[in-house]
Structures are given as C-alpha cells and as structure tokens.
C-alpha cells in the first residue's frame, strides 16, 4: 500500500517564531506504513549510490538515518552537537536557520578514507547542517556519495548551497514546500 506522505506532515504556523510555518514529521514517524515508505524510498536511492555508511546530523537525522542504515545492512555515523562525543572528534561550525551558530562533531575514527557516505536528514532548510556534516566527512577522507531528505523547504535555497562551487552530488527529496 502506498500513501501520500504529505498527509503525514503537520504544519505548525508561527513556530518557532512569527511568520514561520514549521513542518513536523512526527505524524509520519508515528505511522508505520508512512515511515517505512519514506525510509524505503531513501534506501532505493542509496542502493544505486553504492554507499558504505549513512551519516545524519543530530537529532532528526538519527531518526531517518538509523532505520535506513539498518535496512541497508550498513553502519550509521551520528553527527553530534559540539561537546557530546566522548572520544576524539572532528568538528565543523555552521549558522543556524534562525540566527546564531552551532558546531557538529563526528568521532575521528568513524569514517575511513575512501568510504562512501550518504548524508540524510528529515528536512533541508538552509543547508548549513548538511554542509557542516559534509565538511567533517571530507576532513576524515570520506566521499559524500549523495544527500537525501524527507522534506525540502525550497524557498530557503539549501539545495543550491549544498551544490555550490562545483560540489554537485546525487540529491533526493521526498516532499517539497
């Protein structure tokens, strides 16, 4: 059975600030059929990329990436917020969508040189989180094989920021707003 994933996204107006329509995938994750359909669609995309690992930024990248890695029988690499990892890590800073700056980190032994990595997240907004994750993967010698999202907010131009300067990679979005 195939479902319309758009029916499983709640829109919360004026959150987290006035004028913003927050796209909440909690209903999608709460429905087994919709959640499986989303993960399976990304898994089909990943199979064509011959990936070795899935990476996802904290926190909703974990929700997408973990079942995806399981479905593909490969490892998952969490990109954690700064200061959360207990061992030596590589980091990258990025700007937050609503102002400010943050840092992501990945353990320095999580990705071996030459490993092909698919970066996944629930939602693409400005591209900052994904570019920071990409920067760390490349510092570790990994190859970003592609990126995938459940939702893309097209008016924030995150796709263009990810692909800028000749850095095109295979790209999948299941829904756009």
UniProtKB/Swiss-Prot annotation:
Protein's recorded name: Adenine phosphoribosyltransferase
NCBIfam families linked to this entry: apt (TIGR01090), PRK02304.1-2 (NF002633), PRK02304.1-3 (NF002634), PRK02304.1-5 (NF002636)
Xref: PROSITE patterns: PUR_PYR_PR_TRANSFER
Biochemical pathway: Purine metabolism; AMP biosynthesis via salvage pathway; AMP from adenine: step 1/1
EC category name: transferase
Record keywords: Cytoplasm, Glycosyltransferase, Purine salvage, Transferase
Localization per record: Cytoplasm
EC number of the protein: 2.4.2.7
GO annotation, biological process: adenine salvage; AMP salvage; purine ribonucleoside salvage
Lineage: Bacteria, Bacillati, Bacillota, Bacilli, Lactobacillales
Matches recorded under HAMAP family: Aden_phosphoribosyltr (MF_00004)
Keyword Zinc-finger tagged: no
Membership in a protein family: Belongs to the purine/pyrimidine phosphoribosyltransferase family.
Record organism: Leuconostoc citreum (strain KM20)
Record field: catalytic activity: AMP + diphosphate = 5-phospho-alpha-D-ribose 1-diphosphate + adenine
Function recorded in the entry: Catalyzes a salvage reaction resulting in the formation of AMP, that is energically less costly than de novo synthesis.
